[in-house]
Amino acid sequence: MMQTGLDFTLVEDLVAGVDEVGRGPLCGAVVTAAVILDPTRPILGLNDSKKLTEARREKLYVEIQEKALCWFIARAEVEEIDQLNILHATMLAMQRAVEGLSITPRLALIDGNRCPQLSVPSAPVVKGDSKVPAIAAASILAKVSRDREMAAFELIYPGYGIGGHKGYPTPVHLEALARLGPTPIHRRSFAPVRAAHEARATIMMGGSISPSVGLLQD
């Protein structure tokens, strides 16, 4: 299927696009990216990362880094998500992405309906990753970066299927969580993780099960 991209002539000088990946998963960091595209160096096929194949995202990931005026990938860790909540952690990670840019944008366009506190003017754009090329580019950088990290965690924490579901609460993930217990990269503030942790702790206290290598440590 032909994957058409956004109109690159929409790119404006020194406007950063900002997006996040990983608000919904039960494990791993929330990853953000900020990108300022170069209007003189077109990138064909930019679109919401979720609308692209993995192979296309990987190619665009390299091309964006080569052709953009500047870009920065940031994150908020699991501990920050649990401490702040996922919304505030996402805003913090977006703030870090914009602050990490080597060029100060005159405007930051944020995917979604709210903006983090920034030192530059900003505006939210609902479904911006399918409207604004710079936001689409940011969504690609964030998604490829996070997906690669999840693939690495698959090797560190086998049995959970993390490389496949990327941490999202699929039946496979929920079953593994109940069977194996949470890992150190699971978000304890998320209800399914907390429930699995408490259930497993209760069973262990009863002496009927030995600790799993994946079990969260207090």
Curated annotation (Swiss-Prot):
Endonuclease that specifically degrades the RNA of RNA-DNA hybrids. The lineage of its organism: Bacteria, Pseudomonadati, Pseudomonadota, Gammaproteobacteria, Pseudomonadales. Manganese or magnesium. Binds 1 divalent metal ion per monomer in the absence of substrate. May bind a second metal ion after substrate binding. Keywords: Cytoplasm, Endonuclease, Hydrolase, Manganese, Metal-binding, Nuclease. It comes from the Bacteria. Residues 13-202 form the RNase H type-2 domain. HAMAP family: RNase_HII_B. A divalent metal cation binds at residues 19-20, 111. This is Ribonuclease HII. Its EC number is 3.1.26.4. SUPFAM superfamilies: Ribonuclease H-like (SSF53098). It catalyses: Endonucleolytic cleavage to 5'-phosphomonoester. GO terms for molecular function: manganese ion binding; RNA binding; RNA-DNA hybrid ribonuclease activity. The gene is rnhB. It is found in: Cytoplasm. It comes from Pseudomonas syringae pv. syringae (strain B728a). GO terms for biological process: DNA replication, removal of RNA primer; mismatch repair. It is an enzyme of class 3 (hydrolase). Belongs to the RNase HII family. Its cofactor is Mn(2+); Mg(2+). InterPro entries: RNase_HII (IPR022898), RNase_HII/HIII (IPR001352), RNase_HII/HIII_dom (IPR024567), RNaseH-like_sf (IPR012337), RNaseH_sf (IPR036397). GO terms for cellular component: cytoplasm; ribonuclease H2 complex.
